[in-house]
From Swiss-Prot:
Active site (record annotation): D91 (proton donor/acceptor), K153 (schiff-base intermediate with acetaldehyde), K182 (proton donor/acceptor)
Entry function: Catalyzes a reversible aldol reaction between acetaldehyde and D-glyceraldehyde 3-phosphate to generate 2-deoxy-D-ribose 5-phosphate.
Gene name as annotated: deoC
An example Gene Ontology molecular-function term: deoxyribose-phosphate aldolase activity
This enzyme's EC code(s): 4.1.2.4
Species the sequence originates in: Streptococcus pyogenes serotype M28 (strain MGAS6180)
Coiled coil: none
InterPro entries noted in UniProt: Aldolase_TIM, DeoC, DeoC/FbaB/LacD_aldolase, DeoC_typeI
Tagged with keyword Cytoplasm: yes
Protein name, entry field: Deoxyribose-phosphate aldolase
The UniProt record lists the keyword Chloroplast: no
Record's keyword terms, sorted: Cytoplasm, Lyase, Schiff base
GO cellular component: cytoplasm
Paired cysteines (S-S): none
TM stretches of this protein: none
Length: 223
């Protein structure tokens, strides 16, 4: 797999709580220059970012982030507001308290409501795999499939661990047809990226890959 093919799967990400507009601009510029799938940024920057890229790049943002325990109504509003401001893709965090209470019906209904608010925009569902048992992850693969979401996503990157090969293997085995997989959190090498893709991920959330590619390009004058 060529580096360009890896980059096309990347949501180039900056979600730091202290992110400044110049830092966001750099993320956007790099994402456009390297033709990544999107740039994933805080919702407060979406409107300005959408105007800045002027349709040249998909803008992704997060809702219910990073803990997921805001109400469904609040998440629906966040989704609608983000889309109105120019977001193309939404990454939502599920309410893990519902999962731990065994209330998967509530999780599914919340995702359905947010998908309806998304309309034809892409919805990715963050399940925070590092906080799940294997059985819970398998159950959530079914929940996300039934809900109509476009992607199941491993991690926020703000919890105890990010994506693992094992979790992506489970997702690939149990998620339904038509639902894609996004691996995110801790992807820090091109080899890891290739492995996640080989295991079934079609989108990668990372802030590091472009830096690695730039370093390699300095050595070889190309990517």
């Amino acid at each position: 797999m060529e580096v360009k093919d890896i980059l096309k799967t990347v949501d180039h990400t900056l979600l730091a709580t202290t992110a400044t507009w110049p830092e966001i601009q750099t993320i956007l510029d790099d994402a456009m220059a390297y033709e990544t799938a999107s740039a994933c940024i805080p919702a407060s920057y979406v409107k300005k970012a959408a105007e800045y890229v002027s349709g040249k790049l998909a803008i992704c943002t997060v809702i219910g982030f990073p803990n997921g325990y805001s109400t469904t109504a609040a998440k629906v509003f966040e989704c609608q507001d983000a889309i109105q401001n120019g977001a193309d893709e939404i990454d939502m965090v599920i309410n893990l308290t519902d999962v731990k209470n065994g209330d998967f019906d509530t999780v599914e209904e919340e995702i359905r409501q947010i998908k309806a608010a998304c309309q034809d925009h892409i919805l990715k569902v963050i399940v925070e795999t590092c906080q799940l048992t294997k059985e819970e992850l398998i159950e959530l693969c079914g929940v996300v499939t039934r809900s109509g979401a476009d992607f199941i996503k491993t991690s926020t990157g703000f919890s105890t661990a990010g994506a693992t090969f094992e979790d992506v293997e489970v997702m690939a085995k149990y998620v339904g047809e038509g639902v894609k997989i996004k691996a995110a959190g801790g992807i820090s090498s091109l080899e890891d990226a290739k492995t996640f893709i080989a295991l079934g991920a079609s989108r990668l959330g990372t802030s590091r890959i472009i830096k690695i590619v730039k370093n390699e390009a300095t050595k070889t004058d190309s990517y």
